[in-house]
Amino acid sequence: MENISEKIPGIGRIEPYRDEVTNNLYLLFRDKGFAKPFNQRQMSDGTLKMLCYLLLIYDPNPAPFICIEEPENGLYHQLVSALVNELRDHATGRKNGSQIFITTHQPYLVDAMQPEEVWILKKEKMDFRLYNVLVKFLM
C-alpha cells in the first residue's frame, strides 16, 4: 500500500482497519493536513477511482488483459497524465505486465499518450477500420 499511497496526491498513508464489532475491513487514509485518519467514505470519487486503478495494476498476479472505459471520468485532470504513465509502466515495464485497452473521447487523455499507443476505431458504412495514429497520420 505504500507504493500506491505515494502516487495519490494528498494521501500520506493507507492502512487497513478491521472493525471488531462487524468484522468489516476498511481502509484508513492518513494525510499530513489532518490529525485523524479518514475512511474511504470520506474520499472523493476521483481519488477512489485512482486508487482502484492502481490496485488493479499493482496486483501481484494481474489480469493478462485489462479494459478500461473512459478512465478520465471523475478524475482530476492532472491525475490523468499520472494514470497514463502508471498504466504504461505496468504494461511495458515489468514481467507479467498486462495488455491494456482504453477507450476515450477526451483529447487530454490522448495527449498524455505516445502516438504509437493511440489507435482509432472508425465506422465506415457497414464496416469498421482500425488505424494506428503513428502509421496513419505521422508517417
Across the structure, where does each feature detected by a protein language model lie?
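Conserved ABC ATPase signature
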Residues: 5-58, 68-77
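C-terminal lobe/lid and adjacent interdomain/linker elements of RecA-like ASCE P-loop ATPase modules
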Residues: 81-139
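Loop/turn-to-beta-strand initiation segments
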Residues: 62-64, 76, 95-101
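Secondary-structure boundary motif
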Residues: 6, 59, 89-93
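Substrate-recognition/cap regions that form aromatic- and gly/pro-loop-enriched pockets
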Residues: 57, 63-65, 77-87
